[in-house]
Amino acid sequence: MCSSDLLMETLNVSSLWGLPVVFVCENNGFSEFTPAAEVTAGRIADRARAFSVPAVEVDGNDVTEVWRAAGEAIARARDGGGPSFIEARTYRIQGHFEAESFVLGNGRYRDNEEIEAWRQQDPIALFRDRLVSSGTAGAVDLDRIEAGVLDRVADAAAYAEAGQPADPELAETLMFAPEPAGSRQQESEA
């Protein structure tokens, strides 16, 4: 999507109007099954710069680097400095969609060694290691936090699975705002 006309229009308007928007491009190196370099000319962050939107490129697998860039962009937006663009370079470990192997068969577009090399750069594991090695947090404390999160996720999944299916008759009830009183009457009189 970082090459789409919609993004270009949005960057233009946000810059023109000085909107407090923070754009984050998760550049995973692919456009579906094609390496991004084969379908995208130039640097993605330069697209934002072309519209005078401050842009930074960060290692999307470095939690601290992303946090700092986001903090600066958020501060700029809150201070009335207009939009910012963050390109977080990372890698897509999972496929583009669940049925990818069925659709592609053996026609894989990346090899297992490449995927495994990037798996070793998991941002959560790297940040955890940094927290423990710096003494900022203990492994036991982080294990307890992770266990608590996993429990909450399991509880939420169990709650959802135990719930009743939605009533199909209600499917469209919250899609539109209520019509103002008398609006249909005004249309018929026109």
Where are these regions (language model features)?
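C-terminal intrinsically disordered, low-complexity extensions immediately downstream
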Residues: 155-190
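Glycine-rich ThDP/TPP pyrophosphate-binding loop and its adjacent helix/strand module
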Residues: 4-155, 159-162
